[in-house]
Swiss-Prot record:
Pfam families attached to this UniProt entry: RNA_pol_A_bac, RNA_pol_A_CTD, RNA_pol_L
Native organism: Mycoplasma mobile (strain ATCC 43663 / 163K / NCTC 11711) (Mesomycoplasma mobile)
Swiss-Prot/TrEMBL catalytic activity: RNA(n) + a ribonucleoside 5'-triphosphate = RNA(n+1) + diphosphate
S-S bonds: none
Notes concerning its domains: The N-terminal domain is essential for RNAP assembly and basal transcription, whereas the C-terminal domain is involved in interaction with transcriptional regulators and with upstream promoter elements.
EC number: 2.7.7.6
Gene Ontology CC entries for this record: cytoplasm; DNA-directed RNA polymerase complex
Full protein name: DNA-directed RNA polymerase subunit alpha
Alpha N-terminal domain (alpha-NTD) as annotated region, ranges: 1-246
Keywords for the protein's UniProt record, in alphabetical order: DNA-directed RNA polymerase, Nucleotidyltransferase, Transcription, Transferase
Length: 333
């Protein structure tokens, strides 16, 4: 069997901004492998990297998500949206799989703004966007919140989290006596953006060799180096099983308790949740696309055929969908 060439993996220091935004180079690769590896790693980065996210909220005096709170400027839906955006640094030694953790807040200070930094956290936990505004109060002691978080992967909508809350409600502890547990969407993906490029190396070899460069931007909850390492381990775990021709058995790659269902949970997600530009949103709306599930059924060519969608809008929609673990069929890579 022909030996493979020695591959080098390095960080591109010239493009490094910090631990959470940097670029990596893999070279030399045989012709075609740069795109093959880049596509696989990119998709795993966007869909399967572990992180921590809220899944349930309890607010003092709030029985459902459509209420208003006395002496609080924001209504409950606005507060829930902001709580969902709390970003917590992921450390598997602190946030164990299958366990539930609580963030608590009590506005015992005078009237004013309340931020993510005002939450009491589990020991060792850190909020990476402490300046996130949660609410503005007109008096002291009017807002008390418990936010329940867990480790996971991908995207879980509030309907699935409702079912999960019903299953584990007896394990949720809260000092808030009057109020209901409210489910929120969980976006576990710690990746903000990932892209790759492939190019031929200028060598004297008669064999064409390629360079793969991957640019990764995370949300600050995990550093880029650990993210790409985790993606590679996931791919290797799958490929090792496929390569074991003597044991053609079905095996679970991910440990029990950290596994989210692979099928997409997009039936209840409206396109408003994609946070698209007005031009892209209106084009989809005029074409009668209202949910992410409808877009999931499209190919990239179908998307290109929608009236008033230019290349920039198409790229925006594709990028937003991938954050929900939805990948449009692009044909042959």
């Amino acid at each position: 069997m022909e030996k493979f060439i020695k591959i080098n993996w390095t960080e591109n220091k010239t493009k490094r901004i910090n631990d959470f935004s940097t670029s990596f180079i893999v070279q030399p690769l045989e012709k075609g492998l740069a795109t093959t590896l880049g596509t696989a790693i990119r998709r795993v980065l966007l869909s399967s990297i572990s992180s921590v996210a809220p899944f349930a909220v309890k607010i003092k005096g709030v029985e459902h998500e459509f209420m208003a709170i006395n002496k609080v400027t924001e209504d409950v839906p606005q507060i829930l949206l902001r709580l969902r955006d709390i970003k917590i640094a992921y450390n598997p030694e602190i946030f164990e799989d299958g366990k539930i953790y609580k963030l608590s807040l009590k506005s015992n200070k005078e009237a004013g703004d309340i931020y993510a930094k005002d939450f009491i956290l589990p020991i060792g936990a850190e909020i990476v966007n402490p300046g996130l505004l949660i609410a503005t109060t007109a008096a002291a002691n009017v807002l008390e919140i418990d936010v329940f978080v867990r480790a996971g992967r991908g995207y879980v909508d509030f309907e699935e989290n409702k079912k999960y809350i019903d299953e584990i409600k007896t394990n949720l502890t809260s000092s808030i006596s009057n109020g209901q547990y409210i489910a929120v969407d969980s976006n576990f993906s710690p990746i903000e953006k990932v892209s790759f490029s492939s190019s031929e190396l200028n060598t004297s070899s008669v064999i064409v060799q390629e360079k793969l460069e991957m640019e990764i931007v995370t949300k600050g909850t995990i550093d880029a180096k650990n993210a790409i390492a985790q993606a590679a381990k996931i791919l290797v775990a799958h490929l090792n099983i496929i390569g074991d021709v003597n044991s053609l058995n079905i095996k679970d790659i991910f440990e029990e308790g950290n596994t989210e269902k692979e099928h997409s949970k997009t039936q209840n997600i409206l396109i408003q949740s994609l946070d698209l530009s007005i031009r892209s949103f209106n084009a989809l709306k005029r074409a009668n696309y209202t949910t992410v599930q409808q877009l999931e059924a499209l190919s990239l060519d179908d998307l290109k055929n929608i009236k008033n969608l230019g290349e920039k809008s198409i790229n925006e929609i594709v990028e937003k969908l991938e954050k929900y673990n939805v990948f449009l069929d692009k044909g042959e890579e």
